[in-house]
A protein has these predicted regions:
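Generic helix-packing signal
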Residues: 24, 59, 105-107
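Hydrophobic beta-strand-centered segment that forms part of the acyl-chain substrate-binding groove
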Residues: 52-86
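Secondary-structure boundary/capping signal
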Residues: 18, 59-63, 109
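HotDog/MaoC-like acyl-thioester-processing domains
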Residues: 6-8, 12-17, 79-81, 88-122
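Catalytic strand-loop segment that frames the active site of acyl-thioester-processing enzymes
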Residues: 2-42
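Short, well-structured hydrophobic secondary-structure segments
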Residues: 17, 40-56
């Protein structure tokens, strides 16, 4: 699983909230093929995975994405950006958790994701 570890550092963590960083570098393989308007852009699927991994760290367990309630991109995330991810647990029922994740770069909102995950049964 280490080859898919996308979270670089956890800055703060409580029982219901976590703040973490993803340093976006040109060396990431996704930039070879994801060019928009002659500019490498971090794919939304990778951003979704980063936010999901931050959620897993918050919950302290491996989860599976059950539902994307909403996802909105406000700005492109490009090499050199430091994506600050804040994930908040909104509600938990058993092994099902509703979360919201917000990604910012230099204080400017890049993405917001409302999602539901299910804990691994093992």
């Amino acid at each position: 699983m280490d080859q898919m570890k996308l979270v670089d550092r956890v800055l703060d963590k409580s029982s219901n909230k976590i703040i973490a960083l993803k340093n976006v570098t040109i060396n990431e393989p996704c930039f070879r093929d994801h060019i928009i308007d002659n500019e490498p852009v971090l794919p939304g699927s990778i951003i979704l995975e980063v936010i999901g991994q931050v959620g897993d760290i918050l919950l302290g367990t491996v989860t599976y994405l059950a539902k994307v309630d909403s996802m909105r991109f406000y700005e492109k995330t490009i090499p050199g950006d430091q994506l600050k991810i804040e994930v908040v647990k909104l509600k938990s029922i058993g092994k099902i958790h509703k979360l919201i994740g917000v990604g910012t770069v230099d204080g400017k909102r890049h993405v917001e994701l409302k999602f539901t995950v299910r804990e691994d049964d093992e």
